[in-house]
């Protein structure tokens, strides 16, 4: 008998969507009786649909306020996010078929979790962290502290929480390793398929508009280097547009970005977990330049020895990283995460 459930995805950027796709594939490989109807707004919706899953259009989450790669006062985002929760909550109460869909998996999407708990639907969450720490000014700290308090009360009622970063020692929390989408072919075949004949630098800005500063700086640094044995592939994402130039090839959106990460010789990214984890799993050298004051991205970048100010060193870093060759791949945590989710489904959904 088929077990159908919702898989809600936080739609700010594409990192949550790529992780959700990887987990859904892993679950379906182990259990062909599972069916997921994804709930997502743009741009996550497009990536999920391009990977072959059914998806119901949901309200989109707000983007961070930013200018030239610097996050603005985050109280503005918290106000917008509170409005999003109200809009998404009304949508889920009206459109959700909670009688037919017997469980909820959520990658970072909170409105669906609140509604599922209200309806006593078994719920599992996948998170980077259980609390936010972006606030720099007093108004932002007030809103962030309240948001963290509110979410901690909600999170304790969730059946299972899988967390990538350090988390409280709650009985429903499990730490997991990096989740990545599997590569579709060996590296050399992918390079042939993509016609990568030179050393290839892949630049990706993620799914938000905040990465424009990195696209601009990376292309400028590459052109200044005049590397005859290298080319650059720029993936601007759904919210930005990059202009092609000699030796620079541009794409707006790639549903199989992980394959380009494996095929490339160097990845330059804004330090989102998804692309960083895929580069580490592929053994591809990576330069991570985080948006300034984006605490999560700064933490990801710092773990690899980078910070926002390294934007001024891109020429030097590109030459250095192209010279080191491939790196040992980092093991992924997909199998462990899938096992936790299957245990949740068997124990909480099997008898419903």
Where in the sequence are the language-model features?
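A short, glycine/small-residue-rich beta-strand->loop->alpha-helix junction that serves as a flexible
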Residues: 8-21, 209-213
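A nucleotide-sugar donor-handling region in carbohydrate enzymes
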Residues: 141-209, 237-239
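Donor-nucleotide binding loops and adjacent catalytic segments primarily
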Residues: 24-26, 187-266
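Conserved nucleotide-sugar donor-binding subdomain of glycosyltransferases
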Residues: 71-106, 110-111
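A donor-sugar binding/catalytic signature common to diverse glycosyltransferases
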Residues: 104-107, 125, 256-299
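Active-site proximal beta-strand in glycosyltransferases
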Residues: 117-134
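Conserved nucleotide-sugar phosphate-binding/catalytic loop shared by glycosyltransferases and other
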Residues: 4-5, 11, 34-85, 311
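C-terminal amphipathic helix plus adjacent low-complexity
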Residues: 320-352
């Amino acid at each position: 008998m088929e077990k159908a459930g919702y898989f809600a995805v936080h739609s700010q950027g594409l990192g949550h969507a790529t992780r959700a796709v990887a987990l859904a594939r892993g679950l379906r490989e182990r259990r062909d009786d599972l069916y997921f109807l994804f709930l997502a707004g743009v741009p996550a919706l497009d990536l999920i649909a391009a990977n072959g899953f059914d998806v119901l259009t949901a309200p989109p989450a707000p983007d961070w306020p930013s200018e030239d790669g610097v996050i603005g006062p985050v109280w503005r985002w918290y106000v917008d996010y509170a409005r999003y929760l109200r809009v998404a909550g009304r949508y889920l109460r009206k459109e959700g078929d909670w009688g037919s869909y017997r469980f909820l998996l959520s990658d970072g999407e909170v409105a669906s979790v609140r509604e599922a708990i209200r309806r006593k639907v078994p719920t599992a969450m996948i998170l980077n962290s259980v609390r936010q720490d972006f606030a720099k000014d007093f108004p932002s700290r007030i809103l962030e502290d309240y948001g963290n308090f509110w979410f901690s009360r909600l999170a304790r009622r969730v059946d299972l929480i899988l967390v990538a970063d350090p988390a409280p020692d709650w009985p429903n929390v499990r730490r997991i390793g990096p989740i990545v989408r599997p590569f579709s072919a060996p590296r050399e075949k992918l390079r042939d398929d993509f016609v990568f004949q030179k050393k290839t630098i892949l630049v990706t800005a993620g799914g938000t508009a905040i990465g424009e500063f990195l696209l601009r700086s990376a292309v400028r640094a590459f052109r200044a280097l005049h590397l005859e044995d290298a080319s650059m592939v720029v993936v601007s994402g759904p919210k930005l547009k990059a202009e092609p130039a000699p030796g620079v090839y541009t794409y707006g959106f790639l549903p199989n970005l992980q394959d380009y990460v494996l095929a490339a010789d160097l990845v330059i990214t804004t330090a989102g977990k998804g692309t960083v984890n895929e580069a580490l799993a592929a053994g591809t050298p990576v330069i991570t330049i985080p948006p300034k004051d984006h605490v999560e991205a700064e933490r990801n970048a710092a773990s690899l020895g980078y910070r926002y100010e390294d934007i001024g060193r891109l020429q030097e870093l590109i030459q250095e990283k192209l010279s080191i060759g491939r790196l040992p791949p980092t093991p992924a945590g997909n199998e462990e995460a899938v096992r936790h989710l299957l245990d949740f489904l068997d124990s909480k959904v099997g008898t419903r």
